Amino acid sequence: MTQRLFVTGLSGFVGKHLQAYLAAAHTPWALLPVPHRYDLLEPDSLGDLWPELPDAVIHLAGQTYVPEAFRDPARTLQINLLGTLNLLQALKARGFSGTFLYISSGDVYGQVAEAALPIHEELIPHPRNPYAVSKLAAESLCLQWGITEGWRVLVARPFNHIGPGQKDSFVIASAARQIARMKQGLQANRLEVGDIDVSRDFLDVQDVLSAYLRLLSHGEAGAVYNVCSGQEQKIRELIELLADIAQVELEIVQDPARMRRAEQRRVRGSHARLHDTTGWKPEITIKQSLRAILSDWESRVREE
């Protein structure tokens, strides 16, 4: 039986992949069309978004760039918290009573001691930047809404996800773009990066999407789920692998302007709860992800 799905943030990195994923995969979900432009900070624009009532909602939209959150924390909180509240209120006014999946972030955990790795959902969050604060606050709001309104509310905490189409403000996309330019003779074989002597838990965007859809079907109401690979990858090694795939020799140079605050040296999450509840597991290898990202950037660079 086909179920109606409404998704915010369809124009973003994950949203675009979700549209393609639903069009190509055999799933019980039919993506509802968006009848007009809307702004989550303008409640009047939300009232008639749903000619057909959705069975489920995935709330992807938000301000996700950490440096921007430091630059304008008020705006980040408005978009990520007040925008979420406006969406919840509009859905309630429309009579929604289905499944609501809020997409938070693994960044809410903050600084985690290496002895506490891998990161489990039971770990108490200690957000260290305004973006993470806004996501944790919105998590609480959504879970409270589920209790008081009787909706089936779930929270996903994705860790770093990667794939074709990501902005080059993210480290792997930035490296892939620069390497693609080197391969085409458009820049010197000198790669400018931020702090790459750290490890992160990277997951392909296709695996992220399959996790979200599994949660819609099988997740437990009121629960929080890490969405991650369960593996840590050193960023420097991934850049070297990108260069190897592209067959490009390069010099790596750290750019102080690209360094971020509130970094920690190692990140590795646990997806045990997600696997135990839904049967989900990652399917795409890191090398497959990097090949797809590099191929995408080679095409985009040719069009620049």
Swiss-Prot record:
Q: Which GO terms describe its molecular function?
A: GDP-4-dehydro-6-deoxy-D-mannose reductase activity; NADPH binding; oxidoreductase activity
Q: Where are the transmembrane segments?
A: none
- List its EC numbers: 1.1.1.281
Keywords in alphabetical order, please: NAD, NADP, Oxidoreductase
Kindly list the biological process annotations in GO that this record carries.
Answer: GDP-D-rhamnose biosynthetic process; lipopolysaccharide biosynthetic process; O antigen biosynthetic process
Chain residues that bind substrate = 105-106, 160, 200, 260-263
Q: Which residues bind NADP(+)?
A: 13-14, 39-40, 131
The UniProt record lists the keyword Oxidoreductase:
yes
Keyword NAD present in the record's keywords: the answer is: yes
Q: What class of enzyme is it?
A: oxidoreductase
Record's function text? Reductase that catalyzes the conversion of GDP-6-deoxy-D-mannose to GDP-4-dehydro-6-deoxy-D-mannose (GDP-D-rhamnose).
Which family does the record claim for this protein? Belongs to the NAD(P)-dependent epimerase/dehydratase family. GDP-6-deoxy-D-mannose reductase subfamily.
The protein, known as: GDP-6-deoxy-D-mannose reductase
Q: Which organism is it from?
A: Pseudomonas aeruginosa (strain ATCC 15692 / DSM 22644 / CIP 104116 / JCM 14847 / LMG 12228 / 1C / PRS 101 / PAO1)
In the record, what lineage is assigned to the organism producing the protein? Bacteria, Pseudomonadati, Pseudomonadota, Gammaproteobacteria, Pseudomonadales
What gene name does this entry carry? rmd
